[in-house]
């Protein structure tokens, strides 16, 4: 379990943090304004047709989860393609490592998207985006601090280090570092 929560020392991997931030910004901006169309648009008419509010919220959460899954699978395909170009073995990890990476990556991005959705429901879309980005930045900085101090328990509450754990071996090569910022 300690190998799962160790995370990545972000001070040595600036390209990893930049590529992960670009990917999270894709997810956040894809979900931008997702709740406003239900609050101020045709959501009023669905409520008038005797649809439940929980059903509408379920639609919003399902759309959020599906978009996170699509973006995560797209990222995995891009990484596999870059490794194929370099003629490296794609399956250097065990199946448990790969499934652990996929599961934690989807969960961390889903948490950020749910955080954005809840803030959008209460305040505005801009407040949701600012909250999601600030949570990601604070979580990444605190994750690096806790790794330096070798305090692994607080990392359980910081989701971004979960998603970056198993990717360091995949994108640490020089060839991939040049293109990772533009592709992901």
Specify the residue positions occupied by each region the protein language model found.
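Interfacial "coupling" helices/loops that link adjacent transmembrane helices in transporter permeases
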Residues: 42-60
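Transmembrane helix boundary and interhelical loop/hinge segments in multi-pass membrane proteins
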Residues: 13, 30-48
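Membrane-helix interface segments
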Residues: 52-54, 124-129
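Transmembrane alpha-helices and adjacent helix-loop boundaries
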Residues: 37-42, 72, 122, 126, ...
């Amino acid at each position: 379990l300690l190998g799962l929560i160790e995370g990545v020392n972000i001070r040595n991997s600036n390209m990893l943090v930049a590529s992960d931030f670009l990917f999270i910004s894709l997810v956040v901006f894809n979900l931008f304004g997702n709740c406003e169309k239900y609050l101020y648009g045709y959501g009023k008419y669905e409520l008038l047709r005797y649809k439940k509010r929980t059903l509408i919220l379920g639609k919003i959460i399902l759309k959020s989860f599906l978009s996170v899954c699509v973006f995560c699978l797209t990222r995995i395909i891009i990484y596999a393609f870059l490794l194929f170009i370099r003629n490296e073995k794609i399956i250097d990890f065990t199946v448990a490592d790969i499934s652990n990476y996929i599961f934690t990556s989807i969960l961390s991005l889903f948490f950020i998207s749910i955080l954005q959705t809840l803030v959008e429901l209460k305040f505005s879309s801009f407040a949701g985006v600012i909250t999601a980005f600030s949570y990601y930045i604070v979580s990444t900085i605190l994750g690096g601090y806790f790794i330096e101090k070798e305090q692994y328990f607080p990392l359980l509450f910081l989701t971004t280090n979960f998603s970056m754990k198993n990717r360091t071996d995949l994108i640490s090569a020089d060839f991939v570092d040049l293109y990772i910022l533009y592709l992901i």
